[in-house]
Amino acid sequence: MSKEEILEAIKNMTVLELAELVKALEEEFGVSAAAPVAVAAAPAAGAPAAAPAEEKTEFDVILQEVGSDKIKVIKVVREVTGLGLKEAKDLVESAPKPVKEGVSKDEANQIKAKFEEVGAKVEIK
């Protein structure tokens, strides 16, 4: 199978199928898909010093702490991300973890409010 065929197959997958694929790849190769995100975000931390006039337009919502009602938090994760029950549960149990990335400030604040309503602690970066 060529690289182009693999990419074409991935393009035709649903979000749920992609989430399952990522999980299977993580298990198969013993890696975490979240690690590259954290590494990629680290250099950006120094960037504002170079361009202070540029305002950030994309934000990441990171689930820091679940709180006392894990089931309600899982429901909010499913609502916000569209993940299946198992994927949402895995995300909640592996907090701190990004829930939604590259969203507008308004959307990030709305998502944060939903999580805070059910007792979870979220950070917007």
Swiss-Prot record:
Keywords for the protein's UniProt record, in alphabetical order: Ribonucleoprotein, Ribosomal protein
Family matches, as InterPro entries: Ribosomal_bL12, Ribosomal_bL12_C, Ribosomal_bL12_C/ClpS-like, Ribosomal_bL12_oligo, Ribosomal_bL12_oligo_N_sf
Pfam families reported for this sequence: Ribosomal_L12, Ribosomal_L12_N
Domain of life: Bacteria
Annotated TM spans: none
GO cellular component: cytosolic large ribosomal subunit
Example GO molecular function: mRNA binding
A biological-process GO annotation: translation
Keyword Ribonucleoprotein applies: yes
Protease is among the record's keywords: no
Description of how the protein assembles with itself and partners: Homodimer. Part of the ribosomal stalk of the 50S ribosomal subunit. Forms a multimeric L10(L12)X complex, where L10 forms an elongated spine to which 2 to 4 L12 dimers bind in a sequential fashion. Binds GTP-bound translation factors.
Family per similarity comment: Belongs to the bacterial ribosomal protein bL12 family.
Function: Forms part of the ribosomal stalk which helps the ribosome interact with GTP-bound translation factors. Is thus essential for accurate translation.
Name this protein carries in UniProt: Large ribosomal subunit protein bL12
